[in-house]
Regions:
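Juxtamembrane helix-loop-helix junctions in multi-pass membrane proteins
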Residues: 52-78, 132, 194-219
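Membrane-interface helix termini and inter-helical loops of multi-pass transporters
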Residues: 56-66, 93-95, 126-129, 171-172, ...
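C-terminal transmembrane-helix exit sites in multi-pass transporters
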Residues: 123, 140-160, 284-303
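Helix-helix packing/entry segments at the starts of transmembrane helices
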Residues: 135-139, 203-218, 257-292
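Hydrophobic transmembrane alpha-helices of multi-pass small-molecule transport proteins
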Residues: 81, 159-175, 186-192, 301-320
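Hydrophobic alpha-helical transmembrane segments of multi-pass membrane transport proteins
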Residues: 45, 49-53, 57, 108-127, ...
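C-terminal-most transmembrane helix of multi-pass membrane proteins
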Residues: 2-6, 74, 176, 181, ...
Length: 339
């Protein structure tokens, strides 16, 4: 989620933890719904549940490497989205989006950033570093805060400074424990934050699926060149490991688009506070999958690092809730004064 302060452009939830942002336009600073719709809550939780279990699915794609996973994901996501747009009768909208010269720069930038994010995510799975992916997405709200400071000139509240300071301490502890900087976690958090920043700073007027399709169209050269290089090196396992493996790889297209659709539907019927809470579902599930299923180790120093991140997020969340409550109170007071 992209949040700095309740009223800032970068403070509005709307980015998914698998690197796809629903283009719903500018969201209001105060939720338009008085309460959360149970159906929307179910849809939102399902979307984050799928994203949280994605590392488990990717682990089943062995012996495919990280580069092949990304290349094939681009290809099958494009196919699935084109079929979906056809069923939705929005193919014309895609043509309009691609024919708008002013959108090419933003679409290309977003596509490039999300390709890097997908690659780092795949690397985290294929190298046994899913815990770093979890750490990266836990850190994402804090990275969004820093992006607001760097690019929007926003000022942090005291609670936000405390949260960022604790997060920095967590990175230091994790670096000492690992003997190196957790570059996968930092790369995921940064690329994901930048992607969300671009999507919210330059919102697209088209449907979320249309926007995602346009981005995958831009990535077609990556798909073509990557497929050729992998085939020449004998590493294109999608077509050499049998039909079962092929369809598992094809499933990446479905898992890219379907959760996005669920999230987009949920975002229209949930408060921003609820969306902000739901975003932690994915990294929590990634953490549990890494430790209990994939067998990644959690020595004491790593527990300390994650503990500091969780403490930082607790401080951050309390600060956000307090700020949101004060804003709603101010809005009600203003409405009462003009009644």
């Amino acid at each position: 989620m992209v949040r700095v302060s309740p009223s800032s452009p970068s403070a509005r939830p709307g980015v998914t933890p698998d690197g796809a942002a629903p283009d719903t336009g500018a969201l209001p600073t105060v939720s338009p719904v008085p309460a959360d719709d149970p159906r929307g809550l179910a849809l939102g939780f399902t979307a984050y549940f799928v994203w949280g279990l994605l590392p488990l699915y990717m682990a089943m794609l062995a012996p495919a490497g990280a580069l092949e996973i990304v290349v094939v994901r681009i290809g099958f996501a494009l196919i699935f989205c084109l079929v979906l747009l056809g069923l939705m009768r929005r193919l014309g909208e895609l043509g309009t989006a691609l024919a708008t010269p002013g959108r090419w720069g933003t679409t290309g930038l977003a596509a490039g950033i999300i390709a890097v994010n997908w690659l780092l995510y795949a690397v985290s799975v294929t190298t046994g570093n899913v815990l770093q992916a979890s750490l990266g997405y836990f850190m994402n709200p804090l990275v969004n805060v820093l992006l607001g400071v760097l690019f929007l000139g926003e000022r942090l509240r005291r609670g936000q400074w405390v949260a960022v300071g604790i997060a920095v301490a967590a990175v230091v502890v994790m670096s000492a424990a690992m003997g190196q900087v957790p570059w996968i976690a930092l790369g995921l958090a940064t690329s994901f934050g930048l992607y969300g920043f671009v999507k919210k700073r330059f919102p697209s007027p088209v449907h979320a699926v249309t926007a995602m399709t346009a981005e995958t169209v831009v990535l077609i050269p990556v798909f073509v060149v990557g497929s050729v290089l992998l085939a020449q090196a004998g590493l294109l396992t999608t077509v050499t490991e049998g039909p079962g493996h092929f369809w598992l790889m094809a499933g990446l297209g479905v898992l890219t688009a379907v959760p996005l659709i669920l999230f987009s539907a949920a975002a229209r019927s949930l408060t921003l506070t609820t969306l902000g809470m739901l975003q932690y579902t994915a990294p929590i599930l990634q953490f549990l999958v890494a430790v209990t299923v994939l067998g990644e180790q959690m020595p004491a120093a790593r527990w300390a690092g994650f503990g500091l991140i969780w403490l930082s997020l607790a401080v951050f969340t309390v600060d956000q809730l307090n700020a949101s409550r004060l804003q709603r109170r101010a809005v009600r007071a203003g409405q009462g004064a003009h009644a």
